[in-house]
Amino acid sequence: MITRLVMIFSVLLLLSGCGQTPFKGKIEKVGMLFPDTINDLVWGTKGYKGLLNIQSKYNVDVYYKEGVKTEEDIINAIEDFHKRGVNLLYGHGSEYAEVFNLVGEDYPDMEFVISNAKAKADNVTSVHFSGEAMGFFGGMTAAHMSKTNQVGVIASFTWQPEVDGFIKGAKYENPDIEVNTKYTDHWDDDTTAVKLYQKMKNEGADVVYPAGDGYNVPVIQQIKKDGLYAIGYVTDQSDLGENTVLTSTVQNVDKAYEIIAEQFNKGTLEGGDHYYDLNTGVVEMGTFSPLVDQDFQQRIAKLIKTYNKTGELPKNE
């Protein structure tokens, strides 16, 4: 059943728009599909935040559905939103790419938005987060703070560029560091992720990067109980414990969605693949723990500045 935004949100957002210039752009109504919940405090919550910001800025009706995973459910949701007048539809994840690319031409009056997947239809836009660089600097931080000379990565899938970046960054900071990498093969398998963490801990890892948005919170909570260190993922997770989360690799998908909405509203959006890196404000490093020394933080900041200018990550000579 379709979920309209809670009435109190609608009232507040409409009130905040009073006195503004009436809407005259291309956006009519906006929809968003979520494969899971909007309450995960990570990926889903970020997407929902973007939807709320779009509603507030453009004073338009917005709709969302959670738990939309199967091809049949996706197609039914598209048709439902189309009937409601939605002309900008976000599929919050790569799992929507196949269906959006397939049926996009059947809905020429709609613009479809996906993430981290190839856009193939003329009216499909894909938001890509260039994860290697953020992973690199997260890996540097992990290696710098490790006392056991062992760090770990619990990733969801082998294709995640931030994992390769993390390994390279850890090796750049400390060529002798050991990086233990494991995969859950699912974004949300917190049971498997916590078990993998326990194994890594027993093998000596004292800094772990849980690179999966559906399980990183429970893993970090366990890391905190054990008195070890974590690198946060997707959101700035310093609020989970500033003495636990050394820094975070942040993907501001909400900002990316707002950029796409603004371009669509102005009629300047070019479909296809849009890439966002550390120089865009969409991808960034999160708050550093006070345990991370200032000299290292300043060195990281200089390396990021150089990367933003050259597009090249540092290498050991």
UniProtKB/Swiss-Prot annotation:
Q: How does it sit in the membrane?
A: Lipid-anchor
Q: Which domain of life is it from?
A: Bacteria
GO CC annotation terms, alphabetical: plasma membrane
Q: Which residues form the signal peptide?
A: 1-17
Gene3D superfamilies listed in its UniProt record = 3.40.50.2300
Q: Which residues form a coiled coil?
A: none
InterPro entries the UniProt entry points to: BMP_lipoprotein, Peripla_BP_I, PnrA-like
Where are the S-diacylglycerol cysteine lipid anchors? Answer: C18
**CDD domains annotated for this entry?**
PBP1_Med-like (cd06353)
Q: Which SUPFAM superfamilies match?
A: Periplasmic binding protein-like I
Name the lipidated positions (N-palmitoyl cysteine).
C18
**Keyword list, A-Z:** Activator, Cell membrane, Lipoprotein, Membrane, Palmitate, Signal, Transcription, Transcription regulation
The record's subcellular location field reads: Cell membrane
Q: Which family does it belong to?
A: Belongs to the BMP lipoprotein family.
Q: What does this protein do?
A: Positive activator of the comK gene.
> What name does the UniProt record give this protein?
Transcriptional activator protein med
- Provenance organism: Bacillus subtilis (strain 168)
Q: What is the lineage of its organism?
A: Bacteria, Bacillati, Bacillota, Bacilli, Bacillales
Which gene is transcribed and translated to give this protein?
med
